[in-house]
Swiss-Prot record:
Keywords: Carbohydrate metabolism, Cell wall biogenesis/degradation, Cellulose degradation, Glycoprotein, Glycosidase, Hydrolase, Polysaccharide degradation, Secreted, Signal
EC number per UniProt: 3.2.1.4
GO cellular component, one term: extracellular region
EC class (word): hydrolase
This protein's name: Endoglucanase 20
Amino acid sequence: MGKLLVLMLVGMFLAFESLEALEYGDALNKSILFFEGQRSGKLPTNQRVKWRADSALSDGSLANVNLIGGYYDAGDNVKFVWPMSFTTTLLSWAAIEYQNEISSVNQLGYLRSTIKWGTDFILRAHTSPNMLYTQVGDGNSDHSCWERPEDMDTSRTLYSISSSSPGSEAAGEAAAALAAASLVFKSVDSTYSSTLLNHAKTLFEFADKYRGSYQASCPFYCSYSGYQDELLWAAAWLYKATGDKIYINYVISNKDWSQAVNEFSWDNKFVGAQALLVSEFYNGANDLAKFKSDVESFVCAMMPGSSSQQIKPTPGGLLFIRDSSNLQYVTTATTVLFHYSKTLTKAGVGSIQCGSTKFTVSQIRNFAKSQVDYILGNNPMKMSYMVGFGTKYPTQPHHRGSSLPSIQSKPEKIDCNGGYSYYNSDTPNPNVHIGAIVGGPNSSDQYSDKKSDYSHAEPTTYINAAFIGPVAALISSSG
């Protein structure tokens, strides 16, 4: 009888573990599906998000270039190439790092398609060696309207960087995105992979040769942290993609640029570069010791109980860096924590020292897992912050296409001001934007499900992109 009870308990435990694995797999699936709702341009025949339709089919015509496609960045209808490139880099990082886990739930093909939708657009935007289009659409006029992308009639103004008007941040991030993606496609489409890598090299040369901050060339998504982080980030990815020592030597020569930081974002990539480069340190590149020190500083700043903790969690345990769209920082931090714990394990390093406190790899992973679980529902609100995941989730994300009737259900045009009756309606959005992760709760773990609360209710591509790696990391440890 005792033996039978043990077997029953083991069976129940395994069943729970399998269910948990299925839940992470479902979250991964929905995280990727979200991007189909953000697509701009001519939609493919295998489009799964049916409430969307073709949009912005003349983008680029003002300059006689083809800038059709890519992603709408958030809940608006503008295409911002700098954060779109960061999104693409993060997606590719997940595909590289967790290929087996993503394949195990049959999502690798969808993820590659998601990446390619971004890289195809970046390639189009890179019209000559020293020219990159960085924005399509006028942010001010777009943000004053509440329209479906399919009805959009605001100006599709074009912005670009060049040798005479540089933006090293945007060019550097585009280089990183294409270099990372070249690794994703290397084994399945070598010709496309080579094209990506060639453009990545050229973009890096452009970013480095014509150094200038994107602050001077942008109306939205301007740089605050400078361009040195993007140059290090791009060089790290190019080294990973090519093995060419010119890139690792570039990093070593400019290691003094590296800073200990407390965030990883579309603007600040220092810790992303550090996390990539610390792998090379453990492979014997002692000249990269500063990057090891800086990434450890980031980890120590995040870990609860660390004597050098700088980011305090909410009462419910969520990392809280900024009130506006805080989950973007949570998902990127979690990306770094999982990657770094994996790097330590591979190097045979069991722990790190944070001042007077030591943290094991398991403790770092468990904390990272707690952040994923918080987003998926283990939080004081008892709700998922991913639309369509679980039984309770945001129903009014700040998102034009989701909040307005689909063009299939209401073919009549909804103009700039006509959409505000839907915006002001306190009812669930008619189109469930499955997989969208909103900006998240406030510092007290509270969330007001209102379209007007864009700081907390708006999804963005880079929140979702940074979530895919962490949730994939948990698939293998749960099943």
